[in-house]
From Swiss-Prot:
It is an enzyme of class 1 (oxidoreductase). Keywords: NADP, Oxidoreductase. This is Oxidoreductase asL5. It comes from the Eukaryota. Induction: Expression is significantly up-regulated under xenovulene A producing condition. NADP(+) binds at residues 21, 45, 90, 155, 159, 188, 190. PROSITE patterns: ADH_SHORT (PS00061). The active site is at 155 (proton acceptor), 159 (lowers pka of active site tyr). Belongs to the short-chain dehydrogenases/reductases (SDR) family. The keyword Oxidoreductase applies. It comes from Sarocladium schorii. Xenovulene A is a natural product exhibiting little structural resemblance with classical benzodiazepines yet is able to displace high-affinity ligand binding to the benzodiazepine site of the gamma-aminobutyrate A (GABAA) receptor and could be potentially used as an anti-depressant with reduced addictive properties.
Length: 249
């Protein structure tokens, strides 16, 4: 349990919130006093997450690529809480494919989830954030959006676009009392990363950053809580990297 209670009374939505970084952020937000709605595609993962998160969590099943699902999410938030203070647009998709083998379907999936999904996640949240008098938006980026990675070019391009969304929207959202920032992780030991890389792959991947280790989802969740809170009140349109220094070398 966090001793800091920076989010008491706040309501948050986290897409991709049932596992990995999203779940770690949800756990930290609740520890700091927030009520959290997690949103994701797999009902069994959502059920397990809410069982672990406790009574200050709710789950809504759906995909950020389906506008009707996002409508249901925000209807649930409105019905139970009335307004919304924090949105973490964390749902994402990525595929490792070298140039020359990229398909249209892969582009549609990655950009549909990472870019279109983020746009409509935020757009749908704005009326409820206006009811709260403003708040904080966190977009999950990636260090690959800055550094580039040959097998992840489509994914990296989609995350570079996320950074541009924050910069493009910051002035407009200021007038609504809303701050927007990008949280860009890399080298994080999520379950998906462990399954994809294996134990040996994780060890090799860890050596690519200056700290020579993999980060933990909880370390990203702690930074998300900072960005969600008033401690980051003079930050907007910023990108914060939680990647062991990977994007800086």
């Amino acid at each position: 349990m966090s001793a800091i209670q920076r989010l008491t009374g706040k309501t948050a939505v986290i897409t991709g919130g049932a596992t990995g970084i999203g779940f770690a952020a949800a756990k930290r937000f609740i520890e700091e006093g927030a009520f959290v709605f997690i949103f994701g595609r797999r009902q069994e993962k959502l059920d397990a997450a809410t069982a672990a998160l406790g009574p200050n969590s709710r789950a809504v099943q759906g995909s950020v690529t389906e506008l009707a699902d996002l409508d249901r999410l925000y209807e649930a938030v409105k019905a139970e809480r009335g307004s919304l203070d924090i949105v973490m647009a964390n749902a994402g998709a990525g595929m490792a494919t070298p140039l020359g083998k990229i398909t249209g379907e892969q582009c549609d999936i990655v950009f549909g989830t990472n870019l279109k999904g983020t746009i409509f996640t935020i757009q749908g949240a704005l009326p409820l954030m206006a009811q709260a008098g403003g708040g904080s938006i966190i977009l999950t980026g990636s260090s690959s959006g800055t550094t580039g990675a040959p097998p992840l070019s489509v994914y990296g391009a989609s995350k570079a676009a996320i950074r541009n969304l924050a910069r493009s929207w910051a002035g407009t959202l200021r007038d609504e009392g809303i701050r927007i920032n990008v949280l860009s992780p890399a080298s994080i030991a999520t379950e998906i990363a462990k399954e994809a890389l294996g134990e040996q792959g994780m060890k090799m991947f860890a050596q690519q950053n200056p700290l020579k280790r993999m980060g933990q989802p909880e370390e990203v969740g702690a930074v998300a809580a900072f960005l969600a809170s008033s401690d980051s009140s003079f930050m907007t349109a910023s990108e914060v990297s939680v990647d062991g220094g990977l994007a800086q070398i």
